[in-house]
Structure formats: structure tokens, C-alpha cells
Amino acid sequence: MESKNVCAVQNNQKNSRLSRRKTVIAPLAGNVKRIYNRHENVYTLPPKRERRKYPMTISDIAKLAGVSSAAVSRYLNGGPLSEQKRAVIQAVVEKTGYSPDTAAQTLRTGKVRQVGVIVPSISSQSVGQIISGIASELGASRYLMLLANTELDEQMELEYLTALQRNHVAGIILLGYDSSPQLCKALKDCRVPVVVTGQRFADLPCVYNDDRSAARDLTRKMLEHGRRNIVYIGGSEQDAATGIARRQGVQDALRETGLNADALPRAYCTAFSMEEGHRCMEELLARCPQLDGVVCVTDTVAFGALQVLRTAGRRVGEDVGLAGIGDNWAGKVVEPGLTTIRFYQRQVGQEAARMLLQSLEHSGTDAAPVRQTTLGYTLVERGSL
């Protein structure tokens, strides 16, 4: 019995060796190598390898669009190009999802297609409108926007000016809210083109609103409604535009009517907020209980003043007139609607971006003349006067 088992094992081992010897290998075309799988006793073909995918180049885009590589380069860099070619290239870029290597572009051209934008408060409606205008113009010229929010911190404003230059931005747009000597010097010392909005600096490109005329026309309208005991809630006079110019505009209108403009009762906000409007209105009511008109430096401040007047039993639009500046969306829905000044802030942003792009085009050549642009406004009369 034991000898039979031994014979069976020997026969199995022999058959196994014979099986391995008789494995048939089919001939393969070319130089394709077989892989022997010793566990399955078979030869297999190697797995197919996916071809390496290389990123698309300008040349690839040019071939797909049927244009020259130079035309694609001009498209990507915002250069001159016919509308027909621009449309064809844009369609190919969008279809392929092509994105140029910005680092390679910088090495090749020596230009960084990034612009720093410094803002005082990202939560402000007017700031948002200006940013929208800037972004539309920069995007059309293939520039990226780097946003820096100072939260009304003067030191942070100066630090961002330095940091953006260290990051090699092509230029800077500053949404100004003060005009301190330190800021003025820092702007003039910038190594890249700078454009300022909202403030006026000598020898720098600026885009600003006519704050003085706007405040004057707003106060004139209030005077037309028979208001004579007018008070003013203003902003910090470190700000030459909203602080000084708007207060001067109110005084101009009073002076034209023969009133004592220098004696204008006023209180100053530390921030353009409803809370500060509330505080200043309480202060002025205590000092001038006979007041019949209130002009506010911004609409948001006016909303805070409105709360106090209602609590005091003053009927806005009847017992007392109220007006703000800025055309905040909420002014349309409060009751009564708030009379205000509408500035065209998106256009401010667009014009600032155009100025900067023009400066970048002239970099390295004869400098373009410094442009300073004042934009208009509209007086929006509602029921609050």
C-alpha cells in the first residue's frame, strides 16, 4: 500500500515536469516581450501603458485654431488682434481648458501679469462695486487681481504696499481713504505703477468723485424743502474726500443761502457704521433739539440716525429732513426712502484699471502724462426730505 502511494507521488511529479516542458508559446510580431507567470504556468503579454500626457503648448493651440503662435501669444497677453482671430482662439482655449504657465510667461517676457488691489473694507458696498469694475478690465487684459483688505488700518495699508512689491506685482491700485504724509511718500516711492481711487494725490494717477459738489447739491435740495436748522454727521478729516470735501460742500450750500456756515453743528463718526450714526445723532439731538435737517456723510450713517429720530418721535420727511451719500441699496426699501447721492463706483474701478494698464504699456518708454479724472454723480430724491 505504501509503495503504491510513493509511485503515485512520483507519477504526479513526473506529469508536472512534462506539463511545464509542453507549454506552447505562440509567436508574437515585433519586439513585444512575453512575461512568464510561474504560478499559472503561462506566458502573458505586458499590460498596455498609457501614453504620457504632456501639457498643451501655444503651438498646439495655434494648430487647432489655424493661426500663428504669435497670434496666440498676443491673445494671451492682451495684445492687438482682430476680433475674428480672437474669437477663434478663445473658442479653442475654452474647449481644451488650456491655461498658460504664468511662471514660464514671467521668465520669457519679464512681466508679471498680476495687479495688487488694496481696499479699506471688503464689506463696503461701494468698495465691492469698485472691485467689480477693476476685475472686469484686468480680466479682459489677462491680468490676475491680488486683493488686500486693510480694515481701515493705516499701518497695514503701508505694509501691503511693501509686500505687494516684494511679490513682484506689475502694478497697484489703492482704494484710498486717507491722505497722510506717510502714505503719500510710500506711494511716490513705489517701484511699480500706482493708481489711487477716492483721493487726490499730486503727481499720481487718480480717479475720484466730486465729493464737495455732491454734498453741496444735496444740501441745496434740503434747503429747497424749507429746512434751515441743518446739522451734519461727518467723517474723519484725515480723509480729504469724505471727511473734508463733503463737509465743505454742506457749508457751501448754507453760505449761498445766507446762513452761518461756520457755525454748522456737526459730529464726527469714527467709522461709517449704523452704530456711529446712532451715536452722533443722539449727540446732535441733545445739543440742537430744534434741528430740522440732517445731512450724513454716508447712507449707512444715515440709517443709524434714522433709528434715533424715530425713537425721539421725529417724523422723517415731515418734521425733519434726512439725507445720505452713496445710494446704498437699503435706501430704496426703508420708509421713507432715503434721499442720497449716487456715485458711479463701478466706473471708478474701470477707469482706474485702464489708467494702470496704460501705465504698464508705457513702462520702459517715455512715461505717459499723469491723468487725474473726476467722475460725476446723480442726486436721487426720495421721501426723506
Model-derived features: positions:
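Short histidine/acidic/glycine/proline-rich micro-motifs that form metal-
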Residues: 77-79, 121-124, 236-241
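Amphipathic helical "hinge" segments at domain boundaries
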Residues: 43, 47-53, 87, 98-170, ...
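N-terminal helix-turn-helix DNA-binding module of bacterial transcription factors
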Residues: 17-20, 24-113
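Short gly/ser/thr-rich secondary-structure transition/capping motifs
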Residues: 95-101, 155, 175-177, 306
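Bacterial carbohydrate/catabolite-sensing allosteric modules
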Residues: 2-56, 95, 136-141, 189-196, ...
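Short hydrophobic/charged patches on amphipathic alpha-helices used for structural packing
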Residues: 104, 158-161, 184, 219, ...
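Short beta->alpha connector loops
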Residues: 151-154, 175-180, 201, 300
